[in-house]
Design a protein with these regions (language model features):
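Conserved catalytic cores of phosphodiester-cleaving nucleases, focusing on short active-site segments
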Residues: 87, 165-173, 177-201, 222
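Substrate-binding/catalytic groove segments of enzymes
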Residues: 99-100, 178, 192, 228-235
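Gram-negative outer-membrane beta-barrel domains
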Residues: 159-160, 201-205
């Protein structure tokens, strides 16, 4: 059963880890961290040859390679902006704060991307974010029946390896009496298999290179770091995919703690 002593221990365990949002950088005891969890996972991914693939797509669709690369950059940046605004909304929601979407930020975004702006761009953006929020609220209605929030946007790290990350939602299941990690994903889809059978590399070559694997590994690394530093068990983690047309999808992560411990051990100074 969770108590104040548990909460204090959890708070103190990572008090030396800071996250600088503007630069997306972490420090440990005032010293720059070696890498984020996402950067660590990236080391085990096959490089994406964007130019070679863009050449194929450009030829197929009748665009120049540069136009295809620009389209991809726009889609990536748009998705990141939308995801950031959604995460900001959710963090405030758990603090019982209702906020409006940042109109200045989205207008500034499209000012910098005028090539891709249409008369409906802003309207479509609000519709996209409204869908994410609707699905999140459906998730919340399910979640609150058995969970309480412990930390939202919880910054964690491991001094021994220099690896840090941010947990979207660290919850406590008061029915099962255990911690649970939830992570919100706003991307278009979550692929369960590697493209044409693609696998990750090196010691993770037995794993499919796809979103489901990478997100499972991400949350397994969060769990592994938490268990290592606090000794609190985190038996399960879930991806909350909120970009479905009809509703959210609750996706139980693969158990990749063995792999997580292995790659963390290889990061030790």
């Amino acid at each position: 059963m969770i108590n104040f002593e548990t909460l204090i221990k959890l708070e103190n365990a990572f008090s030396n880890i800071l996250f600088y949002e503007k630069d997306h950088k972490y420090t440990i005891d005032g010293i720059p961290a070696r890498m984020s969890v996402s950067q660590l996972i990236k080391k085990f991914e096959k490089p994406f040859n964007s130019k070679a693939i863009a050449e194929v797509v450009a030829k197929r669709d009748g665009f120049s390679v540069e136009e295809i690369l620009e389209q991809w950059d726009f889609k990536r940046d748009y998705s990141c902006h939308k995801g950031s605004e959604f995460h900001k909304y959710v963090e405030n929601f758990f603090n019982r704060k209702q906020i409006s979407l940042d109109k200045t930020a989205i207008n500034f975004f499209f000012e910098d991307k005028k090539t891709f702006k249409t008369k409906n761009s802003i309207k479509e953006y609000y519709q996209d974010v409204a869908l994410l929020i609707k699905n999140f609220k459906n998730f919340y209605d399910w979640w609150k029946k058995e969970h309480i929030i412990i930390k939202s946007e919880f910054v964690i790290g491991d001094s021994e390896t220099g690896v840090c990350g941010t947990i979207d939602n660290l919850s406590y299941n008061f029915v099962k009496n255990e911690f649970v990690i939830f992570d919100y994903k706003t991307n278009k889809e979550i692929k369960r298999k590697g493209f044409k059978g693609d696998k990750m590399i090196d010691c993770l070559s037995h794993l499919d290179q796809c979103e489901f694997t990478k997100y499972s590994l991400q949350l397994s690394l969060y769990s592994t770091i938490m268990e290592k530093i606090t000794n609190f068990s985190v038996p399960s983690s879930y991806i909350i995919w909120v970009n479905g047309e009809k509703d959210y999808e609750l996706i139980k992560c693969l158990d990749l703690k063995k792999e997580s411990k292995m790659i963390l051990d290889n990061c030790k100074y």
